[in-house]
Amino acid sequence: MFSRVLIANRGEIAVRVERTLRRLGIESVAVYSDADAGAPHVRAADRAEWIGATPAAQSYLDVEKVIAAAERAGAEAIHPGYGFLSESPELAHACAAAGIVFVGPGPEAMALLGDKVAAKDAAAAAGVPILPGLSGESLTDEEITAWAAGAELPIVLKAAAGGGGKGMRVVSDLVGLPDALVATRREAQGAFGDDRLLAERYLANGARHIEVQVLADSHGNAVHLGERECSLQRRHQKVVEESPSPVVDAELRERMGAAAVALLQSCGYVSAGTVELIAEREDPSAFFFLEVNTRLQVEHPVTEAVTGLDLVELQLRIAAGEELGFGQDEVRMEGHAVEARLYAEDAAHGFLPSTGRVASYREPAGAVGGPGGGEAIRVDSGIEQGSEVGLDYDPMLAKLIAHGPDRRAALAGLRAGLADLVVLGPATNAAYLRALLAWPEVREGAIDTGLIERLGAEVSPPPAAPVLAAVAFSVLLGPPPSDDPWDARDGWRASGPAWARARLAGPEGEVEVAIRAAPAAPPRERSHFCPDTDEKCEREDWDWEIGEDSGTFSFDGQTLAVDGEARELSIYGDGDAVWLLDGAAEPARFEVVEAVGPEGGVAGGGSLEAPMPGVVIDVRAEAGGEVAEGDVLVVLESMKMELSIQSPRDGVVAEVLVAVGEQIARGQNLIALAEPSTEEGTG
C-alpha cells in the first residue's frame, strides 16, 4: 500500500478521499489554486501544494502542474477524484512516465470508454443492448440529417467525447435539426476540444437513468455492487440518487450487473467504474447502454451505504496491485440509501448558479463524514462558515446521504437532514430538495429523467411569509434590559407601547414594517432572543403591520406563533442583517434600509424614548430650553443610518438624559419633557 497520495481535486471529494487516507494511515497531499488557499480540503490534508491561479485551466486542469506537485511532495500515487482530470488519459500517461501510480484505469481503457463512439461499439460487441442510432468516427451533418429523416423522433445529439450532461441536444422535429447540430458541435468543441457527434433514439415518454457500479482488479477478478437510480435530473445532471433502484428486482439486477462486468472486462478495465444505462420508464427490463464513467461517481456514497464497502479504499488497494478479496456471491445490499446534491443555485429561477460568502453553516445533528456511519445522516462537504462560493468551479457544495431499512425511511431521513441543514449566504437548492422528496411521484418511485422539468415551479418551496419581516425587525431591534417597565427598551410606556417603523430589504424586495410590543404582554414576561445559540429563550409578543397585513405574533427564539399556529423558526445573525429559517421556505435574509421614528407620544413621566438601539451622535436640546413639535432633539446612528428624534409636542426640556457618543438601547429615555409654561409676566 502507498504511504503518501496526492489528491488532484478540491472541495467535498478531496475531503472525502482524505478521510479514507487518514483511516488507512496514508499521508494526504492536497492541491489548491489561489481561490482555495485555506479551504477545508487544504487544511484537512497532511500537506498542501499550490498549483496555480484560480481559473481551472491554470491549476486543476494543468497536467504538468499536478505532476510537478506530486513530485515535490514525494507522492507515490495520484487520486483524481471526479471532474477535472479524473477521466484524462493524458494525466494517466503522465503519471506512468513520472513513475507515479494513477488511482484509476489504464489510459488505454480510459481513452476507449471515454469516447462515446468507441464505447458504444464496445458495448455492442460485449452484448450490452444499445439504442438505435448512428455513430461513426467523424459523422458529418449531412449524414446525421439523412439518418434522422428516416428515424423515429425525437432523437438526441451527443458529443462523442462528452459526458456529465454536456454536449447534448434533444431534437423533436427536423426543422430544428440544423441549428441543433451547430449548437451541439460548438458546445462539444468548447467543453471537450472535440466536435464529433453521434445521434440516437431518444426515449421521449420518459426514461430511467440506472447505472451499475463495477470493481475490477489486475488479477482478473470483477464484481458489480448493484445499481443506482439516477433519474431525478435537471439539465441532464443528477440531483438525487438512490440504491437500490425502486424498480429493479434481483433478476434484472443480475442481468444489468453481468452486462456491465462483461463490458469492462472486455476492455481490460482495472479500477472502479460505472456503466450507465437508460431504461424504459414503464418497463426497466428494456435497458440500453448509455456511457461508461471511468472514475469514482459523485453518487458513490449510496453504494457504500448499502454494501458497507469503502470504494475509495478499494480503488487504492486495486491501484496498489492487491486482489479484490471477495467474489460476487459475497456482495450484500442492506437497506436503502438516498443522496441529495446540495448546489449553490436558485431553484426558483431556472437553477441559475448563485455566489457569495457562506455566512453560516451547520450540518444536521449527528451527521457523520464518509462511509461507515450506519443509519446516521452522512454529509460530504467542502464548505464551512466563511467559504466564498464563486463561478470558477462546479456549484455543488455538499452531499447529504441517508440510509434506512427501506426506501420510505431513507427518504424521511434525508428530508429531516435537509431541514436541519443550515447554509446561509448564496442561494441553495436545500428547500427545493425537501419539497421534491415529498412529491407523490418521488415518494412512490414513479420517476424518470424528465420529471423535474415537467413539474417546473409546482415543486418550488413556498415564499417567505410577510410576518417574517416583522419578526426580523423585532430581532434587529435588540433585547429589553430588565423587568422594570420604566427601564424597558421596547417602546413600552404608561400610555401604551410605541410603534417602531423601518423599511427592510428582504427576499421579496423592500417592505415597510411597523411593530410594537403587544399591550397584552407585560414587559416582565419578555426576555432576549438567542440567535446562533441552543439556549431556550423566553417569549416576546408583538403587534405588526406591513401594508394591509397586520396581526400579532409570539416568538421565543425557536418557535413562532402566528394566529394560534406555531412553527419552528431559527435565527442567524449576519452583521447588521438577520436570517430566518422556517424549514419549508428558502432562508430569508432581512436588513434595515431606513429606520423611521416612532409615532408621537412620550413615555411615562414625560420622557422621549429611543425607537431603536444606536449611538448618540448629536444632542440639540438643552435643559430649560423650549421646543416646538417637530424639533430635532437628538440624532442617533442606528443600523448604519442616522435617525432624527423629534419632539412630539411643544414643551420644555426638563432634563437631557444622554450625551454624544453614548451607546443607547431601544426604548431608553433620551429627553425629559415638561409642559410649556403658561404663566404670564406681571409687567
Predicted regions and their residues:
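N-terminal beta-alpha lobe that positions the nucleotide/phosphoryl donor
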Residues: 1-275, 279-300
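Short amphipathic alpha-helical segments
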Residues: 3, 166, 244, 394-400, ...
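Residue-level signal for inorganic ion chemistry
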Residues: 46, 78, 213, 436, ...
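Short, well-ordered beta-strand elements within core beta-sheets of diverse protein domains
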Residues: 168-170, 201, 248, 396-405, ...
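Catalytic cores of soluble metabolic enzymes centered on carboxylation/carboxyl-transfer
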Residues: 260, 301-549, 632, 662, ...
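Conserved nucleotide-binding/hydrolysis modules and their immediate coupling elements
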Residues: 541-568
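Catalytic P-loop NTP-binding/switch module of NTPases
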Residues: 566-610
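Structured functional modules or segments
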Residues: 598-683
